[in-house]
Amino acid sequence: MVLNNKTALWFMTLVLLLLSSREMVPGAEARLCRVRGTRGHCFNDHGCDKVCTREGFVRGKCNGILRRCICDRQC
């Protein structure tokens, strides 16, 4: 079976399109569990995030009316 130039070009374009679209699919991310940080009360997200990452968590955020520092860790 002999492929002419037009068919070969179409086939290569299709293969490249399929391969490039596969690279755009985001991978599965790890689940995150929320735990209360040891700091307790906080005033801003930046300070809470610094404390949580220093304690080995992924990130931290001030949450709720009482502004508690909540840290995220991988489950």
UniProtKB/Swiss-Prot annotation:
Gene3D superfamilies: Knottin, scorpion toxin-like. The keyword Disulfide bond applies. It comes from the Eukaryota. SMART domains: Knot1. The keyword Repressor does not apply. This is Defensin-like protein. InterPro entries: Scorpion_toxin-like, Scorpion_toxin-like_sf. Keywords: Antimicrobial, Disulfide bond, Fungicide, Plant defense, Secreted, Signal. One of its GO terms (cellular component) is extracellular region. Its main location: secreted. CDD domains: Knot1. Disulfide bonds join 33-75, 42-62, 48-69, 52-71. Residues 1-30 form the signal peptide. It holds the Pfam family Gamma-thionin. GO terms for biological process: defense response to fungus; killing of cells of another organism. It is found in: Secreted. Belongs to the DEFL family.
